[in-house]
Amino acid sequence: MLLPLLLLLPMCWAVEVKRPRGVSLTNHHFYDESKPFTCLDGSATIPFDQVNDDYCDCKDGSDEPGTAACPNGSFHCTNTGYKPLYIPSNRVNDGVCDCCDGTDEYNSGVICENTCKEKGRKERESLQQMAEVTREGFRLKKILIEDWKKAREEKQKKLIELQAGKKSLEDQVEMLRTVKEEAEKPEREAKEQHQKLWEEQLAAAKAQQEQELAADAFKELDDDMDGTVSVTELQTHPELDTDGDGALSEAEAQALLSGDTQTDATSFYDRVWAAIRDKYRSEALPTDLPAPSAPDLTEPKEEQPPVPSSPTEEEEEEEEEEEEEAEEEEEEEDSEEAPPPLSPPQPASPAEEDKMPPYDEQTQAFIDAAQEARNKFEEAERSLKDMEESIRNLEQEISFDFGPNGEFAYLYSQCYELTTNEYVYRLCPFKLVSQKPKLGGSPTSLGTWGSWIGPDHDKFSAMKYEQGTGCWQGPNRSTTVRLLCGKETMVTSTTEPSRCEYLMELMTPAACPEPPPEAPTEDDHDEL
């Protein structure tokens, strides 16, 4: 359409038909000076000399095309050398030049410069540039179409190969699954046996430790060392009191001995020790006291008080007497305090004691074999999942509607950005649109791919992206993308015409229409 417009512009200079002021060339036949004038709406017929007499006779204002008499009239600007234009008749002779040829101000006293020629020149240059963009864009579009044809064939070939290889890989995965399960069975049995043996050993060690504690307690309780613990001997430990009165009565002691008056070592361990274990306190004082911690030499030393002078002999004797009295008082206090509970000897490292020992050589061999089988199975399973994903992606891309000839296919794996004063807008065609603050922050979805929404005659001129992030107390964000012809691919503008509804323009060669044949130049003429 651009080149025909270029051809029409110079033709305007050659056409000049006599007609009343303000009448267009297409309507001049309605204004015949030799006949009465009939209003264009048929509302009246008047003598022709009443046309443009500055009095409105027709309801549609058609009798006053060149004056401002009718409020609903229209004045036609011829604008020779540029584009014709209709203006409301109330702008005629209003002192403002609306027509580039100045014909609307013929009787206002205003002198209008005729700018039509210059405007026509600029218009032709603009149209020529647009025509050049269209030609170059369409040339690139044909390349895009050919590229997609080749790429589509390659993708279809790749899809067939993947679909054929999928069955083989599925069989391999199932085979490796069987191998894995077979390798895991002896591994599981060997690990369970190792666990069981370790737990048995741990239980035996704890039982041995408990028996040693009971033996020590029995030895302490057997004051007369006759090989038995009697009620009287048990009563020497009031902490075993069962009724809370602070003393162990004979009846309570006999109850702890299961009704007997005495018990030997075997019965003591089997029946008595469990009942008194938690309350029993050893008569022996702990001998291994923790050594005082060494001073931290790295810490700054506090200011020390002055060292006192050496004491005299009399002072030393007094200090020794005071220390002896203090020791006697401490011994009396210790005798009154309850003895510490009998506790098992602590291992050097409890974590080491509870830690299961390493597997034996045969068990470790089963574990290594099972792990190798698992690794091979998991690797094959990952390969199968990757292949299935590749198949899905190829099927989706091959079947996607990329335009009449696939010219928009090259946009499928691309993203384009436009930075404004506040935001960075990102368009990934056929996938999503988003925005994020220019100074940093999380992106906000402006919609995901919906469909082509151009008019019926130009379906592929607009895209719709829907179901973006919801607005506060509003709808989900959505974006319409208009596709414009251009030699390059770029987002040229983004606006928000309505709340949460965005409009984006994408320039692309794929949107360029086929241009008409180029008009012959002045030198390219045929001889008659």
UniProtKB/Swiss-Prot annotation:
The modification N6-succinyllysine is found at K166. This is Glucosidase 2 subunit beta. The gene is PRKCSH. Residues 1-14 form the signal peptide. Residues 37-71, 72-113 form the LDL-receptor class A domain. Ca(2+) 3 binds at D222, D224, D226, T228, E233. Heterodimer of a catalytic alpha subunit (GANAB) and a beta subunit (PRKCSH). Binds glycosylated PTPRC. GO terms for cellular component: endoplasmic reticulum; endoplasmic reticulum lumen; glucosidase II complex; intracellular membrane-bounded organelle. Residues 209-244, 245-290 form the EF-hand domain. The keyword 4Fe-4S does not apply. The lineage of its organism: Eukaryota, Metazoa, Chordata, Craniata, Vertebrata.
